[in-house]
Regions:
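Active-site helix-to-loop segments that bind/position phosphate- or nucleotide-bearing substrates
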Residues: 1-35, 42-48, 60, 111-348
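A surface-exposed, charged beta-strand/loop segment in the N-terminal or early-internal portion
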Residues: 65-144
Protein backbone atom coordinates (compact mmCIF):
# COMPACT_ATOMS: atom_id res chain seq x y z
CA UNK A 1 0.00 0.00 0.00
CA UNK A 2 0.95 3.64 -0.31
CA UNK A 3 2.30 5.64 2.58
CA UNK A 4 -0.29 6.26 5.27
CA UNK A 5 -0.17 10.03 4.88
CA UNK A 6 0.31 12.57 2.11
CA UNK A 7 -1.53 14.37 -0.64
CA UNK A 8 -1.83 12.61 -3.98
CA UNK A 9 -3.76 13.25 -7.20
CA UNK A 10 -5.95 10.75 -9.07
CA UNK A 11 -5.23 8.33 -6.27
CA UNK A 12 -5.27 4.59 -6.71
CA UNK A 13 -4.94 2.51 -3.54
CA UNK A 14 -3.53 -1.04 -3.64
CA UNK A 15 -4.36 -3.43 -0.78
CA UNK A 16 -2.31 -6.63 -1.05
CA UNK A 17 -1.91 -7.79 2.56
CA UNK A 18 -4.01 -10.87 3.20
CA UNK A 19 -6.52 -10.82 6.04
CA UNK A 20 -7.16 -7.08 5.99
CA UNK A 21 -10.34 -5.03 6.01
CA UNK A 22 -11.11 -1.75 4.23
CA UNK A 23 -13.45 0.58 6.13
CA UNK A 24 -14.18 4.25 6.74
CA UNK A 25 -13.62 6.48 9.73
CA UNK A 26 -14.70 10.08 9.44
CA UNK A 27 -13.32 11.45 6.20
CA UNK A 28 -10.72 8.74 5.73
CA UNK A 29 -10.50 5.27 4.26
CA UNK A 30 -8.93 2.95 6.83
CA UNK A 31 -7.21 -0.39 6.24
CA UNK A 32 -7.21 -2.57 9.36
CA UNK A 33 -5.84 -5.97 10.32
CA UNK A 34 -8.91 -8.22 10.19
CA UNK A 35 -7.03 -10.90 12.12
CA UNK A 36 -7.29 -8.64 15.17
CA UNK A 37 -10.43 -9.86 16.97
CA UNK A 38 -11.22 -6.31 18.08
CA UNK A 39 -11.58 -5.10 14.48
CA UNK A 40 -15.06 -3.72 13.68
CA UNK A 41 -17.61 -6.07 12.17
CA UNK A 42 -17.99 -6.06 8.41
CA UNK A 43 -21.76 -5.79 8.82
CA UNK A 44 -21.65 -2.59 10.92
CA UNK A 45 -24.70 -0.51 9.94
CA UNK A 46 -23.58 3.04 10.75
CA UNK A 47 -22.38 5.33 7.92
CA UNK A 48 -18.98 5.53 9.56
CA UNK A 49 -17.00 3.40 11.98
CA UNK A 50 -15.78 4.47 15.37
CA UNK A 51 -12.15 4.15 16.35
CA UNK A 52 -11.40 1.14 18.53
CA UNK A 53 -8.43 0.78 20.81
CA UNK A 54 -6.12 -2.12 20.16
CA UNK A 55 -6.95 -2.37 16.45
CA UNK A 56 -3.91 -2.22 14.19
CA UNK A 57 -4.44 0.37 11.48
CA UNK A 58 -2.21 -0.47 8.54
CA UNK A 59 -2.94 2.61 6.41
CA UNK A 60 -5.33 5.54 6.06
CA UNK A 61 -6.18 7.71 3.05
CA UNK A 62 -8.22 10.92 2.61
CA UNK A 63 -11.52 9.69 1.18
CA UNK A 64 -12.04 12.61 -1.18
CA UNK A 65 -8.65 12.00 -2.85
CA UNK A 66 -9.23 8.33 -3.68
CA UNK A 67 -10.99 7.34 -6.88
CA UNK A 68 -10.00 3.66 -7.16
CA UNK A 69 -9.28 0.87 -4.67
CA UNK A 70 -7.63 -2.34 -5.92
CA UNK A 71 -7.74 -5.38 -3.63
CA UNK A 72 -5.90 -8.67 -4.03
CA UNK A 73 -7.00 -11.96 -2.51
CA UNK A 74 -8.35 -12.17 1.04
CA UNK A 75 -9.34 -8.55 1.64
CA UNK A 76 -12.80 -7.57 2.93
CA UNK A 77 -14.85 -4.37 2.87
CA UNK A 78 -17.18 -3.02 5.56
CA UNK A 79 -20.75 -2.14 4.63
CA UNK A 80 -20.23 1.56 5.50
CA UNK A 81 -17.25 1.67 3.16
CA UNK A 82 -19.26 0.21 0.28
CA UNK A 83 -21.98 2.80 0.91
CA UNK A 84 -19.40 5.59 0.85
CA UNK A 85 -17.75 4.18 -2.27
CA UNK A 86 -21.12 4.25 -4.03
CA UNK A 87 -21.81 7.82 -2.91
CA UNK A 88 -18.32 9.12 -3.68
CA UNK A 89 -17.96 7.36 -7.03
CA UNK A 90 -15.03 5.17 -5.93
CA UNK A 91 -14.37 2.21 -8.24
CA UNK A 92 -13.40 -1.08 -6.55
CA UNK A 93 -11.43 -3.66 -8.53
CA UNK A 94 -11.04 -7.24 -7.35
CA UNK A 95 -8.05 -9.49 -8.16
CA UNK A 96 -6.86 -12.90 -7.09
CA UNK A 97 -3.96 -12.91 -4.67
CA UNK A 98 -1.56 -13.13 -7.60
CA UNK A 99 -3.09 -10.46 -9.79
CA UNK A 100 -5.75 -12.15 -11.94
CA UNK A 101 -8.66 -9.77 -12.54
CA UNK A 102 -11.95 -10.99 -11.00
CA UNK A 103 -14.41 -8.13 -11.29
CA UNK A 104 -15.31 -4.59 -10.30
CA UNK A 105 -17.80 -2.48 -8.39
CA UNK A 106 -18.68 0.63 -10.41
CA UNK A 107 -21.04 3.25 -8.92
CA UNK A 108 -24.01 4.13 -11.12
CA UNK A 109 -22.99 7.77 -11.26
CA UNK A 110 -20.11 6.71 -13.50
CA UNK A 111 -22.40 6.24 -16.49
CA UNK A 112 -23.41 9.03 -18.86
CA UNK A 113 -25.84 8.20 -21.64
CA UNK A 114 -24.49 10.71 -24.16
CA UNK A 115 -20.98 9.29 -24.09
CA UNK A 116 -22.16 5.69 -24.28
CA UNK A 117 -24.57 6.51 -27.10
CA UNK A 118 -21.74 7.96 -29.18
CA UNK A 119 -19.58 4.94 -28.43
CA UNK A 120 -22.29 2.47 -29.46
CA UNK A 121 -22.93 4.43 -32.67
CA UNK A 122 -19.35 4.23 -33.97
CA UNK A 123 -19.12 2.94 -37.52
CA UNK A 124 -16.80 0.10 -38.48
CA UNK A 125 -14.63 2.61 -40.35
CA UNK A 126 -14.38 4.85 -37.28
CA UNK A 127 -13.46 1.89 -35.08
CA UNK A 128 -10.76 0.84 -37.55
CA UNK A 129 -9.30 4.35 -37.60
CA UNK A 130 -9.03 4.37 -33.79
CA UNK A 131 -7.51 0.88 -33.76
CA UNK A 132 -4.94 1.79 -36.42
CA UNK A 133 -3.75 4.74 -34.36
CA UNK A 134 -3.32 2.56 -31.27
CA UNK A 135 -1.48 -0.24 -33.07
CA UNK A 136 0.77 2.12 -35.03
CA UNK A 137 1.78 3.69 -31.71
CA UNK A 138 2.39 0.27 -30.16
CA UNK A 139 4.72 -0.74 -32.99
CA UNK A 140 6.61 2.55 -32.94
CA UNK A 141 6.96 2.36 -29.16
CA UNK A 142 8.24 -1.21 -29.44
CA UNK A 143 10.98 -0.06 -31.81
CA UNK A 144 11.81 2.87 -29.52
CA UNK A 145 12.07 0.64 -26.45
CA UNK A 146 14.50 -1.68 -28.24
CA UNK A 147 16.50 1.27 -29.56
CA UNK A 148 16.86 2.76 -26.09
CA UNK A 149 18.49 -0.50 -25.01
CA UNK A 150 20.93 -0.43 -27.92
CA UNK A 151 19.12 -3.03 -30.03
CA UNK A 152 19.69 -2.34 -33.72
CA UNK A 153 18.33 -3.83 -36.92
CA UNK A 154 14.66 -3.12 -36.23
CA UNK A 155 13.74 -1.87 -39.70
CA UNK A 156 11.15 -4.63 -40.02
CA UNK A 157 9.22 -3.06 -37.16
CA UNK A 158 9.35 0.30 -38.89
CA UNK A 159 8.04 -1.27 -42.09
CA UNK A 160 5.22 -3.01 -40.23
CA UNK A 161 4.31 0.27 -38.56
CA UNK A 162 4.06 1.93 -41.96
CA UNK A 163 1.96 -0.97 -43.21
CA UNK A 164 -0.70 -0.19 -40.59
CA UNK A 165 -1.68 2.92 -42.55
CA UNK A 166 -2.75 0.83 -45.53
CA UNK A 167 -4.79 -1.95 -43.88
CA UNK A 168 -8.50 -2.06 -44.72
CA UNK A 169 -9.93 -4.33 -42.03
CA UNK A 170 -9.52 -5.27 -38.39
CA UNK A 171 -8.46 -8.79 -39.33
CA UNK A 172 -5.71 -7.40 -41.53
CA UNK A 173 -4.66 -5.07 -38.73
CA UNK A 174 -4.54 -7.98 -36.27
CA UNK A 175 -2.24 -9.80 -38.66
CA UNK A 176 0.17 -6.87 -38.83
CA UNK A 177 0.07 -6.43 -35.06
CA UNK A 178 0.77 -10.13 -34.53
CA UNK A 179 3.78 -10.03 -36.87
CA UNK A 180 5.14 -6.95 -35.12
CA UNK A 181 4.69 -8.49 -31.67
CA UNK A 182 6.56 -11.62 -32.75
CA UNK A 183 9.43 -9.53 -34.17
CA UNK A 184 9.59 -7.40 -31.06
CA UNK A 185 9.58 -10.28 -28.59
CA UNK A 186 12.25 -12.08 -30.62
CA UNK A 187 14.61 -9.21 -29.71
CA UNK A 188 13.50 -8.58 -26.13
CA UNK A 189 16.13 -10.96 -24.78
CA UNK A 190 18.80 -8.47 -25.87
CA UNK A 191 17.51 -5.92 -23.35
CA UNK A 192 17.89 -8.18 -20.28
CA UNK A 193 20.67 -8.43 -17.72
CA UNK A 194 22.93 -11.50 -17.51
CA UNK A 195 21.20 -14.46 -15.93
CA UNK A 196 17.88 -13.75 -17.60
CA UNK A 197 16.68 -15.09 -20.95
CA UNK A 198 13.52 -14.69 -22.98
CA UNK A 199 12.62 -16.91 -25.92
CA UNK A 200 8.94 -16.40 -26.71
CA UNK A 201 5.77 -14.96 -25.21
CA UNK A 202 3.70 -17.55 -23.34
CA UNK A 203 0.52 -17.10 -21.31
CA UNK A 204 -2.06 -19.06 -19.33
CA UNK A 205 0.10 -20.10 -17.68
CA UNK A 206 3.32 -18.16 -18.32
CA UNK A 207 6.10 -20.70 -18.68
CA UNK A 208 8.97 -18.72 -17.13
CA UNK A 209 9.71 -15.83 -14.83
CA UNK A 210 9.89 -13.15 -17.52
CA UNK A 211 6.54 -14.14 -18.97
CA UNK A 212 5.06 -14.19 -15.48
CA UNK A 213 6.21 -10.61 -14.85
CA UNK A 214 4.96 -9.47 -18.24
CA UNK A 215 1.53 -11.01 -17.66
CA UNK A 216 1.28 -9.54 -14.17
CA UNK A 217 2.28 -6.08 -15.38
CA UNK A 218 -0.22 -6.19 -18.24
CA UNK A 219 -2.94 -6.99 -15.69
CA UNK A 220 -1.90 -4.09 -13.47
CA UNK A 221 -1.72 -1.69 -16.39
CA UNK A 222 -5.02 -2.93 -17.79
CA UNK A 223 -6.57 -2.05 -14.46
CA UNK A 224 -5.18 1.48 -14.73
CA UNK A 225 -6.84 1.75 -18.13
CA UNK A 226 -10.08 0.23 -16.84
CA UNK A 227 -10.21 2.77 -14.05
CA UNK A 228 -9.69 5.67 -16.45
CA UNK A 229 -12.32 4.40 -18.89
CA UNK A 230 -14.89 4.03 -16.13
CA UNK A 231 -14.14 7.42 -14.62
CA UNK A 232 -14.68 8.95 -18.07
CA UNK A 233 -17.91 7.02 -18.65
CA UNK A 234 -16.75 4.85 -21.56
CA UNK A 235 -17.94 1.25 -21.82
CA UNK A 236 -14.76 -0.82 -21.33
CA UNK A 237 -16.39 -3.92 -22.82
CA UNK A 238 -17.07 -2.44 -26.27
CA UNK A 239 -13.77 -2.47 -28.13
CA UNK A 240 -12.57 -1.11 -31.45
CA UNK A 241 -9.79 -3.65 -32.08
CA UNK A 242 -10.20 -6.68 -29.83
CA UNK A 243 -13.24 -8.77 -30.63
CA UNK A 244 -16.12 -8.61 -28.16
CA UNK A 245 -16.24 -11.54 -25.77
CA UNK A 246 -18.35 -12.06 -22.66
CA UNK A 247 -16.54 -10.71 -19.63
CA UNK A 248 -13.59 -9.29 -21.58
CA UNK A 249 -12.95 -5.52 -21.32
CA UNK A 250 -12.10 -5.17 -25.00
CA UNK A 251 -11.74 -1.37 -25.05
CA UNK A 252 -9.36 -1.53 -22.09
CA UNK A 253 -7.26 -4.07 -23.97
CA UNK A 254 -7.36 -1.83 -27.04
CA UNK A 255 -6.07 1.24 -25.22
CA UNK A 256 -3.56 -0.88 -23.33
CA UNK A 257 -1.78 -1.72 -26.60
CA UNK A 258 0.06 1.60 -26.89
CA UNK A 259 1.26 1.30 -23.27
CA UNK A 260 2.59 -2.27 -23.45
CA UNK A 261 6.14 -1.65 -24.73
CA UNK A 262 6.74 1.87 -23.37
CA UNK A 263 5.23 1.41 -19.90
CA UNK A 264 4.77 -2.30 -19.14
CA UNK A 265 7.80 -3.94 -20.72
CA UNK A 266 10.07 -1.09 -19.63
CA UNK A 267 8.91 -1.60 -16.04
CA UNK A 268 9.63 -5.34 -16.19
CA UNK A 269 13.13 -4.88 -17.60
CA UNK A 270 13.83 -2.24 -14.95
CA UNK A 271 12.87 -4.63 -12.14
CA UNK A 272 15.12 -7.31 -13.60
CA UNK A 273 18.10 -5.25 -14.68
CA UNK A 274 18.27 -3.37 -11.38
CA UNK A 275 18.07 -6.58 -9.38
CA UNK A 276 14.84 -5.56 -7.68
CA UNK A 277 13.40 -8.98 -8.51
CA UNK A 278 15.51 -12.12 -8.82
CA UNK A 279 14.81 -15.72 -9.76
CA UNK A 280 14.66 -16.57 -6.05
CA UNK A 281 11.55 -14.40 -5.70
CA UNK A 282 9.35 -16.84 -7.64
CA UNK A 283 7.47 -19.95 -6.60
CA UNK A 284 7.51 -23.17 -8.58
CA UNK A 285 4.39 -22.13 -10.50
CA UNK A 286 6.24 -18.95 -11.63
CA UNK A 287 4.10 -16.67 -9.45
CA UNK A 288 5.88 -14.19 -7.18
CA UNK A 289 6.24 -15.05 -3.51
CA UNK A 290 3.64 -13.29 -1.36
CA UNK A 291 6.03 -10.81 0.25
CA UNK A 292 7.64 -9.99 -3.09
CA UNK A 293 4.21 -9.51 -4.67
CA UNK A 294 3.53 -6.73 -2.17
CA UNK A 295 6.88 -5.16 -3.06
CA UNK A 296 6.00 -5.46 -6.74
CA UNK A 297 2.70 -3.62 -6.20
CA UNK A 298 4.47 -0.83 -4.33
CA UNK A 299 7.11 -0.49 -7.06
CA UNK A 300 4.43 -0.43 -9.73
CA UNK A 301 2.51 2.30 -7.96
CA UNK A 302 5.68 4.39 -7.59
CA UNK A 303 6.47 3.80 -11.25
CA UNK A 304 3.05 5.09 -12.28
CA UNK A 305 3.66 8.29 -10.31
CA UNK A 306 6.99 9.02 -12.05
CA UNK A 307 6.85 11.98 -14.44
CA UNK A 308 8.08 12.28 -18.02
CA UNK A 309 7.74 14.86 -20.77
CA UNK A 310 4.66 14.07 -22.83
CA UNK A 311 5.76 13.76 -26.49
CA UNK A 312 2.56 15.36 -27.80
CA UNK A 313 1.76 18.04 -25.19
CA UNK A 314 5.40 18.76 -24.26
CA UNK A 315 4.86 19.10 -20.52
CA UNK A 316 5.54 16.87 -17.53
CA UNK A 317 2.97 14.24 -16.58
CA UNK A 318 3.03 11.04 -14.56
CA UNK A 319 2.36 7.75 -16.31
CA UNK A 320 -0.98 7.52 -14.51
CA UNK A 321 -1.90 11.01 -15.70
CA UNK A 322 -0.83 10.09 -19.23
CA UNK A 323 -3.25 7.16 -19.28
CA UNK A 324 -6.05 9.45 -18.15
CA UNK A 325 -5.11 12.00 -20.81
CA UNK A 326 -5.16 9.35 -23.52
CA UNK A 327 -8.56 8.23 -22.29
CA UNK A 328 -9.81 11.80 -22.53
CA UNK A 329 -8.46 12.05 -26.09
CA UNK A 330 -10.12 8.74 -26.94
CA UNK A 331 -13.45 9.92 -25.56
CA UNK A 332 -13.21 13.18 -27.51
CA UNK A 333 -12.49 11.23 -30.70
CA UNK A 334 -15.47 8.97 -30.04
CA UNK A 335 -17.86 11.87 -29.33
CA UNK A 336 -16.61 13.87 -32.31
CA UNK A 337 -14.92 16.63 -30.31
CA UNK A 338 -11.67 15.61 -32.05
CA UNK A 339 -11.35 14.52 -35.67
CA UNK A 340 -8.66 11.95 -34.84
CA UNK A 341 -7.30 10.05 -31.87
CA UNK A 342 -3.69 10.93 -31.04
CA UNK A 343 -2.10 7.82 -29.53
CA UNK A 344 0.87 8.05 -27.17
CA UNK A 345 4.00 7.57 -29.31
CA UNK A 346 7.65 7.84 -28.31
CA UNK A 347 10.16 8.53 -31.08
CA UNK A 348 13.32 8.25 -28.97
Amino acid sequence: MKATEGVFDDSVVYVTKQGTQVGVQGGRIVVRDLNDESAPSQTHESPTESSQSGVEVLATFPREQVDTVNVFGGVNFTTPFLARASTDGIVLNYFSQHGQYRGSFVPEQNTIAEVRRAQYALSTAAELALAKSMIAAKIRNARTVLGRKGVRGTDTLRELGEKVTHVNSKDELRGVEGDAAARYFSRLDETLADGWTFETRTTRPPEDHINSLLSLTYVFMKNEVLSALRQLNLDPFLGVFHADRHGRPSLALDLLEEFRPAFCDTFVTRLINRGTITHDDFRRDNHLNDDVFSTYAEKFDSYMEEAFTHPYFDYRVTRREAIRQQTILLRKAITGELDNYHALEFDH
